[in-house]
Amino acid sequence: MAIDSRGRKAARVAGAGAALCLTLLTACGGQVRDADGRTPSTTRSKAASPSPSAKGGAWKIAYSSKADNAELRALSVASDRDAWAVGLAGDDWDKTFFVHYDGRQWRDYDAAADLPKLGRLPLVELASSGPGNTWFFGTGNPVGTQDVASVIARWDGSRWRDVPLPPRMTDQIKDAAVFGPDDVWLLTGTQAGELPGQWPVEEQTVWHWTGAHWTEVRLPARADAIAGRAPDDIWAVGSAPGAQVDNNTPGRRATPAAMHYDGRGWRLVPAPQFQPPVNAGPGDDRSAVLNDVVPAGPDDVWVIGTQSYPGDDPDEGQDEAPVLAHWDGSRWEEGPTSDQLPGPRPVAPDGAHGLVFRWGRLRADGTYEKIDKSPLLPGKTGQVTKFDRAQQLALSELVQVPDTHEVWGAGSIAAGGGGSELNFSHGVVVVHEVPGG
């Protein structure tokens, strides 16, 4: 059984690459090498866009917070009987709250009783290697402020226990990969004082927990996401400085970066190069970053990112579009691009050789299914009024439930604005059952 390193978020695609690659993808130009350094074929094929298809069902609400001023920001699913979610609540969004699923229902959990330092933690991550080993990572103050309050804790099956912080904790927790109580990788970083396309050394740092202390490891490039199937098969993705923007600008364009850990060390894997959309304007002022990685096997890895390129109107600056690519063990192949595809995050495998995004599913046959919104929640009157019908579902996290064709999402359902007394925001967990899964 493959271990998903991020709370069972990224693995379990179960051979998605072979199926999707044949029907969806376009080989990228440029020479790349596989994980063993071999030079593969660089055969190109015609680009494909996802074809429209019937709707893929709707999100179902599995949990809704009692508080009407709350939202969930992180989710980890160790199994279909063990899951955690973390969010913020309160008039000033000053309370961090935990909820736990035991296979029957979601219950509030008083994590503050276990973690006295728990306060307002707007930047949070959850990751798990299985029941009895779920990790929580939280940063208190907004990015770039002083006196950052951070908390790292581990659920051991009975309570949350504090874990020491890395010796030089930065102001942003990005992502984490958990393989066991004594094998955890943590990405941190900073966004203060950066020039475009240039990054401080903190952006190339990953911390490794060995059970007793954190070890600082320098990565070959900046990383924004990390995930893996096993302790000796881990991927990190992000960006690296590319060509200089122009002679008058010190910054450099961002280029995609992919890194692999084989149990001995980290090394760069030549990253995919994305073709600009057909509606892109002239010029080579293009950049791309990888925002997430979904590994399912040595020859089955998805990366998701964002590409910036000149728009058709030079006066309006650059446009952006999501990008996908698949690693088949020897080369990257560019995935489909379409206005139907949503942004790069959140994303999860669907257990049926496809990917699930916020509002749709990319199937193995290349078709795109729209996922409808969840049912309407009653507002503050206890009914669904005209005001309440404007409510929106926002998702911060998507996770495939291990060994199933279900994807769970965490976020909020909210309505209102402008200070209305009818405003509400409920933290929610929603479920999507993959059709035919």
Where are these regions (language model features)?
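Bacterial N-terminal signal peptides that target proteins for export
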Residues: 2-17
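C-terminal motif of bacterial Sec signal peptides marking the signal peptidase cleavage site
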Residues: 24-27
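Residue-level hotspots at or immediately adjacent to binding/recognition sites across diverse folds
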Residues: 29-437
